[in-house]
Amino acid sequence: MSVSFLIFLPVLGLPWGVLSQVQLQQSGPGLVKPSQTLSLTCAISGDSVSSNSAAWNWIRQSPSRGLEWLGRTYYRSKWYNDYAVSVKSRITINPDTSKNQFSLQLNSVTPEDTAVYYCAR
């Protein structure tokens, strides 16, 4: 028997701040099977992924766990990553300067990973 569960991904650009006009556009699959890898991308407009003043985050929200910060990547003369302890062994967040975007990879997903996933600055 094959079991699947949904990964909800809002399709919208989120402006952050009245003056900044920064928009983030998420993309990725809506359905991932248990034990597979979830891969999501967040394209940035109005700012640079390698900005020295920004951090680029992935968060998720589910009825059972509420709002949960997963991790971030940021540039301060070199690249840094911070990850939530709950997913640290399964998560990778990578910047892509050539496409001005950053990505989330979550390995070995389970039904408990079912959530709405957001990227945020």
Swiss-Prot record:
Annotated region described as Complementarity-determining-2, given as residue ranges: 73-81
Keywords: Adaptive immunity, Cell membrane, Disulfide bond, Immunity, Immunoglobulin, Immunoglobulin domain, Membrane, Secreted, Signal
InterPro entries on file: Ig-like_dom, Ig-like_dom_sf, Ig-like_fold, Ig_V-set, IgHV
Highest taxon of source: Eukaryota
Any Pfam family hit: V-set
Signal peptide per UniProt: 1-20
GO cellular component: extracellular region; immunoglobulin complex; plasma membrane
Complementarity-determining-3 as annotated region, ranges: 120-121
Subcellular location: Secreted; Cell membrane
Keyword Membrane annotated: yes
Transmembrane feature ranges: none
Segments for region (Complementarity-determining-1): 46-55
Stored PROSITE patterns: IG_LIKE
Annotated spans, Framework-1: 21-45
Gene Ontology biological process terms from the UniProt entry: immunoglobulin mediated immune response
Domain called Ig-like: residue spans: 21-121
Disulfide bond annotation, renumbered to this chain: 42-119
Start and end residues of each stretch annotated as Framework-2: 56-72
Region (Framework-3): 82-119
GO molecular function: antigen binding
Presence of keyword Secreted: yes
Oligomeric and partner information: Immunoglobulins are composed of two identical heavy chains and two identical light chains; disulfide-linked.
Function: V region of the variable domain of immunoglobulin heavy chains that participates in the antigen recognition. Immunoglobulins, also known as antibodies, are membrane-bound or secreted glycoproteins produced by B lymphocytes. In the recognition phase of humoral immunity, the membrane-bound immunoglobulins serve as receptors which, upon binding of a specific antigen, trigger the clonal expansion and differentiation of B lymphocytes into immunoglobulins-secreting plasma cells.
Protein name per its UniProtKB record: Immunoglobulin heavy variable 6-1
Taxonomic lineage: Eukaryota, Metazoa, Chordata, Craniata, Vertebrata
Name of the gene: IGHV6-1
